[in-house]
């Protein structure tokens, strides 16, 4: 994900780029409907939300791992600077809308390592890039990453919000999986990719994806707790035994993994034009900017829309399309470029 505009080149992978477009749309769409999913009569909203969350962050993080190349200190530090910039912006914004005192604002600014809402992902990118080389020296890196995720959630009490470690560790297997898939060349041009994007492959992806969506809808109607998909609470907080909690988490890992590939199989691999491709390039910019628009949307939705599943889902869907299109535009990215791309060259010694 690159927050600065750049021209398309022949090396741009339209198949994976189109997938990123879908995923960032799902991120925005899911956040738009999030607040209203628990309102009376909004069961369809809850179902749509759960289906989105079963896929969008696991797949988004999978793609981040897929495009991870190597540990580059400058890149890591640029994400660190980016995180502190946006964490400060969030704190100032929240202090304003919540009418916090100056002391409240200062207190928030002095606790920057408890990320605000969506910013846990930036911390995740930083930590995942740092630890991945170490995991790759292990014989079974993916299995060990899953074991770590199960262990941290087996803690009987609540885990600290510091660095959003629980979410970062719990989602790490998807990042590592993305990297390992790339290393094995499974999604590169070749036999596997040809089979995945063949008519039979696309039909298979459609049938599997629809089946999972229907199953999630049924599970939601039967009391599935959406919070499981956030990977932020321990088994103890769900009041379930460790073994049952671990099995649920493993099951969700498996279903999300299947859905990552089944949805990918349906994605067109042709270009829809440079402007559409620009969305895939600007996913990080959209991710960072959309949270403020979403908050404004939540505060301004009239009750007659919020309490109507059809109107809420329909309007949120159209607004998500609009926001993704606008936030990825060159004028918007150019306007916010100082906040989207941090130059950290001054931190490093000059090499001769």
Predicted features by range, described:
Residues 1-352:
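Alpha-helical transmembrane segments and their immediate juxtamembrane cytosolic regions
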């Amino acid at each position: 994900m690159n927050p600065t505009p750049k021209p398309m080149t022949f090396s741009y992978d339209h198949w994976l780029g189109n997938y990123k477009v879908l995923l960032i749309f799902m991120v925005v769409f899911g956040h738009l409907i999030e607040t209203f999913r628990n309102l009376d009569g909004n069961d369809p909203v809850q179902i749509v939300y759960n289906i989105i969350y079963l896929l969008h962050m696991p797949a988004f993080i999978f793609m981040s791992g897929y495009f991870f190349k190597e540990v580059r200190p400058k890149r890591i530090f640029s994400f660190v600077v980016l995180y502190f910039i946006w964490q400060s912006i969030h704190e100032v914004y929240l202090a304003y809308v919540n009418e916090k005192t100056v002391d409240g604002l200062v207190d928030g600014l002095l606790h920057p390592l408890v990320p605000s809402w969506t910013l846990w992902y930036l911390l995740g990118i930083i930590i995942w890039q740092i630890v991945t080389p170490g995991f790759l020296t292990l014989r079974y890196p993916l299995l060990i990453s899953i074991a770590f995720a199960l262990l941290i959630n087996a803690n009987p009490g609540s885990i600290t919000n510091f660095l959003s470690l629980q979410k970062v560790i719990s989602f790490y297997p998807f990042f590592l999986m993305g990297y390992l898939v790339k290393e094995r060349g499974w999604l590169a041009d070749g036999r596997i990719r040809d089979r995945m994007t063949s008519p039979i492959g696309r039909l298979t992806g459609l049938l599997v994806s629809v089946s999972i969506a229907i199953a999630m809808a049924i599970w939601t109607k039967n009391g599935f707790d959406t919070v499981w998909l956030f990977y932020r609470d321990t088994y103890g907080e769900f009041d379930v035994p460790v073994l049952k909690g671990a099995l649920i988490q493993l099951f969700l890992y498996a279903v999300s993994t299947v859905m990552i590939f089944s949805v990918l199989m349906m994605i067109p691999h042709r270009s829809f034009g440079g402007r559409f491709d620009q969305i895939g390039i600007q996913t990080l910019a959209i991710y960072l900017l959309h949270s403020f628009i979403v908050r404004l949307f939540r505060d301004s939705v009239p009750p007659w829309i919020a309490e109507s599943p059809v109107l809420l889902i329909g309007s949120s869907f159209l607004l998500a399309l609009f926001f993704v299109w606008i936030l990825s535009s060159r004028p918007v990215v150019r306007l916010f470029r100082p906040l989207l791309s941090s130059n950290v060259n001054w931190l490093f010694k000059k090499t001769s």
